């Protein structure tokens, strides 16, 4: 069946055989057979796999074997239906990338700040170092999506306010606070940009974007920011493979929760429409609760 039509490797065929045998054993224990099993039996089997500790990816592989099997039975006229059609695939648990420590983020920011203060060989190079420092300070201060960050309007920096208004997914606006460090970096960047652009256009800044570029969008791109961030990480002595703008957004949320922020507040800052999206960070809350119990419970130390 599978080998004839798909040229499957020997190991793959052996895996499918074991998966089908395991399901056949479950079906037999529940009063049916491999050939006669219905949708309810297959759904119950997935529940049994969960109870036995199988990961969602392993369950999905076994369901795939069953789908192939019943698809061929139906196509060959050996069954009048395919009982797997109504079975939902197991959902994989949302996972977070490795959370950067506060120390790693601090090292990254200090490296960017030092490079911004040193400047570059040309005014344009100096502006690029200011831009990268500002991007990092604003990202870690606000937790913006990278698409929101690179498309900030110039007006966000000119108001010099403690809050900036961000247009997020679906055009929904939210106000997020800026840290003093982010405001300082932003002012220094805008001043350097004014000096560079003003010399070319009689004091006027030509772009409405805070981080302009010559590309089609008119503003700095996510890809360019990610590239510059990885290069900075290498110069700071960090593993570039662990760094991305999205990882810094995760660090923002995780560090807030580690320091006692409410999950609902973090939801609002991140711009999540549904609290369930923010709940992927509950592992941070679990760790904080465990530390609190160990620190304050009278028997936590085993005495």
Task: Mark where each language-model region is.
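Conserved catalytic core of the tyrosine transesterase superfamily
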Residues: 1-303
């Amino acid at each position: 069946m599978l080998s004839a039509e798909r040229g499957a490797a020997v190991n793959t065929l052996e895996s499918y055989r074991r998966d089908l045998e395991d399901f056949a054993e479950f079906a037999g224990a529940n009063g049916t057979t491999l050939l006669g099993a219905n949708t309810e039996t297959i759904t119950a089997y997935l529940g049994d796999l969960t109870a036995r500790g199988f990961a969602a990816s392993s369950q999905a592989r076994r369901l795939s074997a069953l789908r192939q099997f019943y698809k061929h039975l139906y196509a060959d006229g050996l069954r009048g239906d395919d009982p797997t059609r109504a079975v939902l695939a197991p959902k994989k648990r949302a996972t977070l990338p490795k959370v950067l420590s506060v120390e790693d983020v601090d090292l990254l920011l200090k490296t960017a700040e030092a490079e911004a203060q040193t400047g570059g060989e040309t005014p344009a190079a100096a502006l690029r170092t200011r831009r990268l420092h500002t991007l990092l300070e604003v990202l870690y201060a606000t937790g913006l999506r990278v698409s929101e960050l690179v498309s900030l309007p110039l007006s966000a920096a000119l108001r010099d306010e403690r809050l900036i208004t961000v247009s997020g997914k679906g055009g929904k606006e939210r106000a997020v606070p800026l840290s003093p460090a982010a405001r300082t970096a932003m002012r220094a960047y805008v001043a350097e940009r004014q000096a560079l652009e003003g010399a070319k256009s009689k004091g006027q800044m030509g772009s409405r974007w805070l981080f302009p570029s010559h590309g089609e969008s008119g503003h700095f791109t996510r890809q360019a920011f990610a590239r510059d961030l990885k290069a900075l990480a290498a110069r700071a002595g960090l593993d570039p493979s662990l760094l991305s703008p999205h990882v810094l957004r995760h660090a923002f949320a995780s560090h807030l929760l580690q320091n006692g922020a409410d999950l609902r507040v973090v939801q609002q800052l991140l711009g999540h429409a549904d609290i369930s999206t923010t709940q992927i960070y509950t592992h941070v809350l679990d760790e904080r609760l465990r530390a609190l119990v160990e620190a304050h419970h009278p028997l936590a130390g085993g005495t």
